[in-house]
Amino acid sequence: MARNIKVEELLQTPIEKQRIELVERKGIGHPDSISDGLAEAVSRALCREYISKCGTVLHHNTDETQIVAGRSSPKFGGGEVLQPIYMLLVGRATKEFEGVELATESVALQAARNYLRKTMVNMDLERDVIMDCKLGTGSSDLRDVFKRDRVPVANDTSFGVGHAPFSELENIVYNTERRLLTDLKSRMPAIGEDMKVMGLRDGEDIALTICSGMIGKYIDDLDSYINMTQEMKIYVEELATHYTERDVNVYINTGDNLKTSCVFLTVTGTSAEMGDDGSVGRGNRCNGLITPNRPMSMEATSGKNPINHIGKIYNLLSTQMARDIVKQVPEVQDVYIRLLSQIAKPIDQPLVASAQIIPKEGTSFEKVKSEAEVVIDDWLSNVTKITEMVIRGELNTF
C-alpha cells in the first residue's frame, strides 16, 4: 500500500540567516530532566523484563513521574540535605501475562535507583531521596493492541516532529552541557549535574547564559568558586570555536551576588534538593533541546512505551528521518518532518508523512524531493527499528 508522503519546498528564511535564534538545554540534573531520565529508565527496564519473562514487550507507560523538591543547607566545604527529595514513579504497566505474575514495581524501583547512581553521583540515595512507585494496571483494550499485528497500530491520533541539521547555536548549546559534565567535570567535580544553557544568537553575536549548580563540598571558599566559574567560562568559549566563527560571550550564574557570598551552591548537584520540583515532558524535546525557532511537539517522549505510543515513536522517528535526509541528500539546507497518525491504524502508514525542505541555493528541488521521499519511505518500512533502538538504549529521549 502506497504511503501518503508529501515533500514540499519551504519558502522560509533558513535558520542560520534569521536575525534572532533562541535555543535552550536543561542538563541531566535539572529536576525536569531527572524526571525524564527516571521515566525512560523505568520503561526500558520494564521492556527488558517483559522480553525476559514473556518473550515480548507488554503495554506500559511511565511518563507521569514527578519530583517534589526537598530542603537543604548548602555551604562551602559541605552542607546537608535537611528534607529528602520525594520522587514518585507513576504510570501504567501490565502486571500479569498468561498466568505469569510480574514484579513491575520492584523492577521500576531498581531501575530508578540505578539511574540515579549513574547520573547523580553526589546524591546519597539512602538519605537524600524518598523513592515511591505507583503503577496502575494497563487497560485491557490497550493491552490487546500489542497482540494484533506484526506492525503495531497507533495508540492515539497524534503527531511527531523533527528537524535537521542542528544550527551552530543548537550545536553549541547541546555540547556545552554535555562537555561540561562529561569532560570538565572529571577535573572539576564541583560542577553539578543541574545545569541550564540558554543560547541567544542576534545576527552574528551569540550570548550563552549558563546556570550551573555547584557542589559545595568541593569548593573551599568564595575565591575558589569564582576561579572555578571563570575556568568554566574559558572552557566554553574555547569549545564554541569548534562550532562557529561568530562572536560568543559566555555568562555563568548571573544570579550570584558576590558581595554577600550568595551564590548557586548545592549539596547534591541538583536544585531538586531545595525548592525546584520536576515533571516529565517539561524540558528538552527528544533531540535534547528546546528550540522555539523550530516546530516542536509538546508530547513527553520519555517513559512512553516504544511499541505503539505515537508521542514517543513519531517524535524519535521524525528526528531520525530528518538527520538521514541531511546525511544522504547534501543539497538540503534545512528539513522539517511531521508525522501524523490515526488511532488504531498501522504506525507504518501515517495519515501523512510531511517533509518541508529548504534546498541549498542553485539546487534542483525535484532531485531533492525524490531522494527525501526514499529516505522517509525506507524508515516507515522499517518503523519497528525505532522500538529496537529504544530498548537497546541507542536513542536519547531528552
From Swiss-Prot:
Pathways involved: Amino-acid biosynthesis; S-adenosyl-L-methionine biosynthesis; S-adenosyl-L-methionine from L-methionine: step 1/1
Essential cofactor(s): Mg(2+)
Paired cysteines (S-S): none
Residues that bind ATP: G136, T137, G138, S139, S140, D141
Biological process according to GO: one-carbon metabolic process; S-adenosylmethionine biosynthetic process
Record-listed E.C. numbers: 2.5.1.6
Catalyzed chemical reaction(s): L-methionine + ATP + H2O = S-adenosyl-L-methionine + phosphate + diphosphate
HAMAP family referenced in this protein's UniProt entry, alphabetically: S_AdoMet_synth2
Cross-referenced NCBIfam families: PRK04439.1-3, PRK04439.1-5
Family in the record: Belongs to the AdoMet synthase 2 family.
Protein name: S-adenosylmethionine synthase
Organism: Methanosarcina acetivorans (strain ATCC 35395 / DSM 2834 / JCM 12185 / C2A)
Record gene name: mat
